[in-house]
């Protein structure tokens, strides 16, 4: 009877725990989804930023024409006159995922536009990311820690920044694939099962198809295997898991057209292959260990490892030298040397996401989890095992990379949420332990302890306290106060995450918002206004020149041909556009004529104080152009005499006469941005411009938006017979005037007449 009651009690507890887990995960999914809809509520269902516009355009093309034609799609509206082969230059996982969801909904007679699927894809996947994080943390620590981690990542600003509604980018689905791949890797390592390793390889294949950050996975998992070997934790489970995963993952990843043979021909993938080979050697050594003497084993191990290691290094450098294996890319070098990209590849350094992360960003995106994260890391180090070595390596490497590049804050956030969940869970378990359970367990062993002497009892109590932890000597009031403080911190995290998501990460870049003194909202829709004008008032084959930041938006919203866009695959072509922007009007006209440019688009924020305009980006245009055309463009020529970058009174003549300056400030000298400001006062820079009377000779103003944010100019077509100016009409005759001889004066002879014979 007692055993039956105990079984029923245990079964009811398991059922209640399962129900609670499902409810918490469902709430985390719902809260994560709802908190990402601020942009939809305030504005409308619209695609955000820059890259998402190309992703949406590519997805729309795939849904209309099919996947096969998508892979063979040649985009003639990009990179004129070169064009772009889309299928072999994109990660198709995002498009395939959206297309599959759209097909399923359409099959169920839920007819929605593909744009709505794209807008709501990232918020939907945030719930899947929370579940994947729960599964990973559960394998690493406990179900309670998993629930904490799932709730953290559901609303963490570090992840929300790339997954709000409308942010249709690769990261929206890639973080789910990242966490799920890590979960399957830990599961396969714990079980040593080929099935889990195969599932891990399939999840990795999805990650490869979705985001270029898959390189982080294919280097972190080998690093984990190498660390286990060095720590003496080699096992057959590790051999089966890694060998199965690496072979399948490499073959599957090569099926993505954009990746191709990179897994076997690039340096970024060679560490994984090296660990694979090392694992075979270690397995062979373990096999031979019980079959030869210890001295023979040490000789074979040390000698064989040294020879094979040296041979591997020689073979690698020979393959790189011979061109069979590509060296490390510039982006890889920029992770180890933050100044490398600025000197050698300015196009990489010009991207704001590639800048180093400030200290404020860590606390802004992570809040209290950044402070608790080291606690969870310490708990994992204190109670280390095979799988916890993985999260330790993940955390340390992610912290470093996030400090080097602000974009990689996205890869740090999952690790922080996992370790913060472990930290909070373990702390709450310590300070909220059931007192009745402790008293019951102590009373069962109390009868034998009462018979012992006081000094013996004191020693036993001391040893028990040492085993249970320091919290045993803490009173219930102190435990209650600490628990309340932790709950307050968690509530503060929720408030902070909601505030940051609402005010910092839920504003589409194509729609700007400001407020008046009395709090009324002002919506500035200049971007879409300009793109709509281009779509309605220019020829279908018109070519638009702009800086590469706006290429995807022009192609997506205006449906016009661009010279460069956000793909940035051709540095020399971008440098040519930068040279045109940096040159004087006549030199720029020659470049634009060669490129068949019809319209030029620039972003100017001097009227409304928009800091992300082209004048503030102009130095990057100069640097990129200088890299390809050092004889024509020199960065120092655009500085003042004191070495400052300015468009004000002290600006250099080169700066005042360049095409970018003229297009930005044309007619601006006549404009007053405030009652107490002089004409030509630039709100963004905070001073009056250096040259107000700007005239244009080779281009003409075509359209300027309401708030002067977007300005469009048209390249003039020069006439075949140029008009001669009046002051140049008199042609001077050089040479001496004849004053002597029979040729002194001219003689007019009568015209010859024809007579009939």
Swiss-Prot record:
Task: Enumerate the residues marked as the site Interacts with target acceptor peptide in protein substrate.
Answer: 51, 353, 617
- Write down the position(s) of the site called Important for catalytic activity: 162
UniProt protein name: Dolichyl-diphosphooligosaccharide--protein glycosyltransferase subunit stt-3
Q: A single GO CC term, please? A: oligosaccharyltransferase complex
Relate the protein's function as given in its record.
Catalytic subunit of the oligosaccharyl transferase (OST) complex that catalyzes the initial transfer of a defined glycan (Glc(3)Man(9)GlcNAc(2) in eukaryotes) from the lipid carrier dolichol-pyrophosphate to an asparagine residue within an Asn-X-Ser/Thr consensus motif in nascent polypeptide chains, the first step in protein N-glycosylation. N-glycosylation occurs cotranslationally and the complex associates with the Sec61 complex at the channel-forming translocon complex that mediates protein translocation across the endoplasmic reticulum (ER).
Glycosylated residues: list them: 559, 566, 570, 584
Write down the species. Caenorhabditis elegans
How are the domains described in the entry? Despite low primary sequence conservation between eukaryotic catalytic subunits and bacterial and archaeal single subunit OSTs (ssOST), structural comparison revealed several common motifs at spatially equivalent positions, like the DXD motif 1 on the external loop 1 and the DXD motif 2 on the external loop 2 involved in binding of the metal ion cofactor and the carboxamide group of the acceptor asparagine, the conserved Glu residue of the TIXE/SVSE motif on the external loop 5 involved in catalysis, as well as the WWDYG and the DK/MI motifs in the globular domain that define the binding pocket for the +2 Ser/Thr of the acceptor sequon.
Tell whether RNA-binding is among the UniProt keywords: no
PANTHER family according to UniProt: DOLICHYL-DIPHOSPHOOLIGOSACCHARIDE--PROTEIN GLYCOSYLTRANSFERASE SUBUNIT, DOLICHYL-DIPHOSPHOOLIGOSACCHARIDE--PROTEIN GLYCOSYLTRANSFERASE SUBUNIT STT3B
What domain of life does the native source organism fall in?
A: Eukaryota
Gene knockout outcome: RNAi-mediated knock-down is mostly embryonic lethal. Embryogenesis proceeds more slowly and embryos are osmo-sensitive.
Catalytic activity line of the entry: a di-trans,poly-cis-dolichyl diphosphooligosaccharide + L-asparaginyl-[protein] = N(4)-(oligosaccharide-(1->4)-N-acetyl-beta-D-glucosaminyl-(1->4)-N-acetyl-beta-D-glucosaminyl)-L-asparaginyl-[protein] + a di-trans,poly-cis-dolichyl diphosphate + H(+)
